[in-house]
Amino acid sequence: MKVRNSLRALKKIPGAQIVRRRGRTFVINKNNPRMKARQG
């Protein structure tokens, strides 16, 4: 999982989902699990 300032590029990748957990924003991608990130 990467920690990024901006998730804008990651959320455009096919299969990406934006999830809010415990006040943090995550991008999870079941199609391409390498594209996981958290907004730092």
Curated annotation (Swiss-Prot):
Keyword Zinc-finger carried by entry: no
Recorded coiled-coil stretches: none
InterPro entries according to UniProt: Ribosomal_bL36, Ribosomal_bL36_sp, Ribosomal_L36_bact
Family: Belongs to the bacterial ribosomal protein bL36 family.
NCBIfam families for this protein: PRK00831.1
One Gene Ontology cellular component annotation held by this UniProt entry: ribonucleoprotein complex
UniProt record, GO biological process: translation
Pfam families reported in the protein's UniProt record: Ribosomal_L36
Keyword Ribonucleoprotein set for record: yes
Gene assigned in the entry: rpmJ1
Annotated organism of origin: Paenarthrobacter aurescens (strain TC1)
GO terms, molecular function: structural constituent of ribosome
Keywords assigned: Ribonucleoprotein, Ribosomal protein
Official protein name in the record: Large ribosomal subunit protein bL36A
